[in-house]
Every structure is written in C-alpha cells, then in structure tokens.
Amino acid sequence: MAYLLREGTQRSTGNEVILNNIAVAKILLEMLKSSLGPKGLDKMLVEGQDITITNDGATIVKNMEVQHPTAKLLIETAKTVDTEVGDGTTSVVVLAGLLLEKAEDLLNQKIHPTVIIEGYRKALSSSLELLKSIADKISPEDRKIVHDLVYTTLSSKFFSTEHTLEKIINLVIEASLAVLDKRDGTYDLDIKNIKIVKVNGGEFDDSELVNGIVVDKEPTNENMPKRAENVKVMLADFPLKLEKTEISMKLGISDPTQIKGYLDEQTAYVKQMVDKIKAMGVKLFITQKDIDEVASYLMGKSGIIALKNVKRSDIELLSRATGAKIASSMKDANESDLGEAKLVEVRNLGKNKYLFIQSDKAKAVTVIIKGSNNMVTDEAERSLNDAFNSIRNLLLEPYIVAGGGAVEEELAKRLRENAGKVPGKEQLAFNAFADALEEYVSILSETAGMDPISALTEIRHKHANGLKNAGIDIVKARIYDNMLELKVIDSLKVKEQVLKSATEAATAILKIDDMIAAAPAKQQPQPQQPNPYLG
C-alpha cells in the first residue's frame, strides 16, 4: 500500500467509513430539522455583505458551502429534488439523515450494510405502492383543491395575515391559469412563462398580476409616447444603427463637406430602417441590441415607443405575450411577424420606471411583488416559486395526500403490517424505514411546539383506529382527525420524489466502505529570481 498510494494519502475502510459518513449526515439533519414544516425556524445566511433570512430548504442548501463528500452528496440530492419538483428539499435531507441514523443502530447490532440496503429498497418499493392506495385522485380543474394545495405551500411562509395570504393564493392561481396549456385532456404549466418583478416599497397587499410583461426599461427618447393602445409590436435581435465592419478601415477626407456627406449617409441608412418599421404600422419596437440617438429621435418623431438592450429572457416572454416573432435582421422583418398589445404604458414602481406591455391573450404574465425591503421580496419570490411548482406537480400527477405528517404515519403503520412478509434480517431494515418515517412526524410536531412523545402516541392511536388522514394541526398545535378538512394537503408527486431521493442517497452512502483522501500534489519550488539591486 505504501508503494501504491502517494505519500500522505489517508485511507479508512469498513464500518469506520460508514459510521463517519453517517455522522456527517446527522450533523446536516440537526442543522435542517428545525426548519421543517410551516412553523419551521428561519436560518440567517451571511456571505460578505449579503444577508438572507429564510426557512426555504432550497435556498439554505444552495448557500451551504460544505467540504465533506457525504455532505456534498446530500446537498446535491436536495438540489435535484428542487429541480424535479420544486419542493421537498428540507424533507429529503431530513429523511435521508433519519434513514442513516436508523441504519447506524442496525450496524451496531452487526447487521451487514448490504442487508440494510436491500431492506430499505424493499421498504421504498412497498411505500410507493402504498402511497398510490392512500392518495386521492382529483380533477386538476377543481379550483378548491388547487387553492388548498397552494394554501398548504404558502402557510409556512411569512405572509402576515389571512387576508394577505388569500390574496397571494388567488394571484398565484390566476397567473397559473393564464399561462396554462391544455391539450387532449392533459395540462402543462411552464413556470418560465411567469415573470416575477420585485419592488421595494409598499405591502404584500399591493402586489398585482399583469396580463403581459413588465420590463424594467424606459423608452429610449423622452419624446416617445408614454401610453398607447392597440399597438403592433415588433421584437428584434438586431441593432438600429450603422454597425461597425469587422475590417478596420480609414477614410481619407480632403474637404470638410465630405464629413457632412458621410454623416448624412449614416443618417439615411438608419432612417431607411425606421421608415420600414413605420410603414409596417409598428408602434412598439423592442430589441435585444442597441438603438442609436438618430434612430431614437426619428422613432419618437413618428410616435413609436422603443426599448433597447432588453434581456433575451424578456424578449422571449414578450414573444409569448404578444404573439410577435423575433426578427433577426431588418431584411427578414415583415408584417406577419408582428404581435399585438392592448395597452403599452410607462408606470412608476417604487423609485423606478417600467414599461407595461399588456394583452388579453397573453401566454406570459408578470407578478409584481411589493415589500418593505430586498430580504422580504426575495423570500416572497421563493415562496411564489414553491407555489407555482406545487400546481405544476398536481397537473403532472393529479393525486393528493393529507399533509401534517398524516401520510408518513399511515405509511409507517402499513409498512409494519407488511414487515412479516420480508424474510430474514432484511425485516429489521424494513421496520427501521418505518421508524424513520415516524421520526419525521415526531420532528414535525416538535417544530410546532408540541411534546413529540405525546403527539406521536396520539397520532399512532388515531391511525390504528382507521383515521388515515389524521395529522398535526401546526396552527393549533394539536392532532386532528382529518387534515384534508383543514386544507392541509400535499402533492403525491412531491412525496414520491422525496421518498425515492432520500432512500437513494441513504443507500448510496451505506454502500461506501472505503475512503481514500489523496494527499495534495507537491508544488514544484519556483526558481529564485536574481535580485536586480544586488551586484
């Protein structure tokens, strides 16, 4: 081994490696479990002068700069869950940590890691089957169900009053309906078609939905109209100016009048482009590139509103909002590529001016969120993204389960009932999986300020008596018989993803029995430079 590995390389093997990795997972579990659920506590994330206060799992894990490879694996798992379903990031790290904590007890009983892994995999397979039987199929067109799902998602956020929460819920639902694509009985919600604009100043109650796109730009010339109705829209990916050639050239000027002639030619070139835009009936011209002063002046004189240097993402949203195609050159532009806007208007939002481009048929919309400061509006944006994702998940898989730990407790109960069918020592791991799910419920009750032992005893009793939807009423810190009545519901898709990802992460860590930490490469000594001040 001394000749195989570089000098200074460290190696550890066997259960020592597994137990060390489990210890790292338990540290992450301790860090995140207090943020679980609607009453979860916030974390303050500090990076230089930037401060973020949040209980959003995705934000917490994205800002954690961990060094240990096991911690990195768990963080990447959480990020994957966030990408797939947009929710459940805290849950997946907590559940993976609990599975590894239970595995540690089995390892101490001399149960082999392979046996534990196989038991966990069988428990996962059984859990996914049981989830389908526990879940209720719903119609995506049932607005009450959609409302309750968004309510559950946003109830863990910091919206101060029930009135504000209801306003934000309705805003989320209306925005989703505006961009919803229904084909052959299936639904598709592309969240990229919903733009969120954050404005400092005002209250959440002042937030609004705009059927169209709001761009943080002003018209390029002060003489341009500040408002126009029923306008034709042109979107461009080319500049309105005389472009520089790739080849450097010099002009020889022998007469001052030649300068004027050269400038007149430039103006004529730009005027030709503006005249074509005007001839097509365009009243709003937006480009991703630059517009020079001459073009701005000429368009202002012609009553055309123009924006320059607009972000590509906004151009694409405007295309979906107005129906305009993006022209790549003036030569290719034609009237059939134009879109329409019912209203174009410059408005003040906070301390800045924005251009509102609205259309009744817009397939892209803007949600304007107002709050007292950046931290508040940033957290509100994260909350809205979670809510939009919850609706998307429901449309992809129209099944719901009761929240508040109800589905985890019911799964734990049914897994224990089926454990007798699992042969050998794998049965111990199968039961440990159920214990981890129940421990998850215990943590949820603790974040609600309840005594976890009393809460777990009561919820077990209710599920044993057939109340499959009994869970933790976080608001009143009690166990309630039917969480669906309290509008506390979760998407089946999120629960499935959390179970799969947590189990995969836990089993991946349990499979590692050898860790080799390579020594850092020795740096070659730099040759000394002669001192010019010495002889």
From Swiss-Prot:
Function noted in UniProt: Molecular chaperone; binds unfolded polypeptides in vitro, and has a weak ATPase activity.
A GO molecular-function annotation: unfolded protein binding
Family (UniProt): Belongs to the TCP-1 chaperonin family.
Keywords: ATP-binding, Chaperone, Cytoplasm, Hydrolase, Nucleotide-binding
Entry keyword annotation includes Membrane: no
Catalytic activity of the protein: ATP + H2O = ADP + phosphate + H(+)
CDD domains: cpn60 (cd03343)
Protein name: Thermosome subunit gamma
Main localization of the protein described in the UniProt heading: cytoplasm
EC numbers, comma separated: 3.6.4.-
Gene Ontology annotations for the cellular component aspect, listed alphabetically: cytoplasm
NCBIfam families, A to Z: thermosome_alpha (NF041082), thermosome_arch (TIGR02339), thermosome_beta (NF041083)
SUPFAM superfamilies per UniProt: GroEL apical domain-like (SSF52029), GroEL equatorial domain-like (SSF48592), GroEL-intermediate domain like (SSF54849)
Organism superkingdom: Archaea
Source organism of the structure: Saccharolobus shibatae (strain ATCC 51178 / DSM 5389 / JCM 8931 / NBRC 15437 / B12) (Sulfolobus shibatae)
InterPro entries (UniProt xref): Chaperone_TCP-1, Chaperonin_TCP-1_CS, Cpn60/GroEL/TCP-1, GroEL-like_apical_dom_sf, GROEL-like_equatorial_sf, TCP-1-like_intermed_sf, TCP-1_chaperonin, thermosome_alpha
Subcellular location per the Swiss-Prot or TrEMBL entry: Cytoplasm
Gene behind the chain: thsC
Subunit structure of this chain's protein: Forms a heterooligomeric complex of two stacked nine-membered rings; one of alpha and the other of beta subunits.
